Amino acid sequence: MSDTEIQAELVAVARDLNVQRATLRLISDTSVFPIAYEHCEPGTASIRDTPRLDMSKQPVVLKMQAGASQVVEDDCAVATNDPGYHEMREMFGGMKAQTVTANRDADGQIIGLLSVHDLTSPRTWTDAEAARARAAADRLDELTR
């Protein structure tokens, strides 16, 4: 695993998708999907050291655990009524839109989550953008195994 290559992929996907933040969360024995790697565009606050959230109860993670390989949210403000989600959204800088893509092991268990966050405005993600996020997640999976 090369930290430099992982960071380079996060930078590339953030710039390709014109987002302000890209994070890679990896499975851990000590917490539920902590942020292992993060890229923030200039002027964007890091969320790596935000207070720990119970990610196991977050709606996106629950969708992933139910089998979704990717969750695309065009407008995070209306994505769910879950108060914990909106608390997280504000802690994460007022996230306006996001795409989260899962990587799984051979048994189908989630081992990684690539998140890309648009902090500027809601947006309609295109199929090409979702595919770019999937390609980045696949590359990150290769780099972290």
Which role does the model predict for each range below?
Residues 1-38, 46-47, 57-58:
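Helix-loop-beta substructure at the N-terminus of cytosolic sensory domains
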Residues 10, 85-86:
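Generic structural marker for isolated residues within well-ordered, non-membrane alpha-helices
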Residues 27, 44-83, 90, 96:
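Regulatory sensory and allosteric helical modules in signal-transduction proteins
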Residues 37-39, 75, 115:
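Short clusters of small/polar residues that mark proteolytic maturation junctions
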Residues 96-105:
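A short, aliphatic-rich beta-strand micro-motif
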Residues 107-118:
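Sensory beta-strand/linker motifs that couple input domains to effectors
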Residues 118-136, 143-145:
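Regulatory loop-to-helix N-cap segments in sensory/regulatory domains
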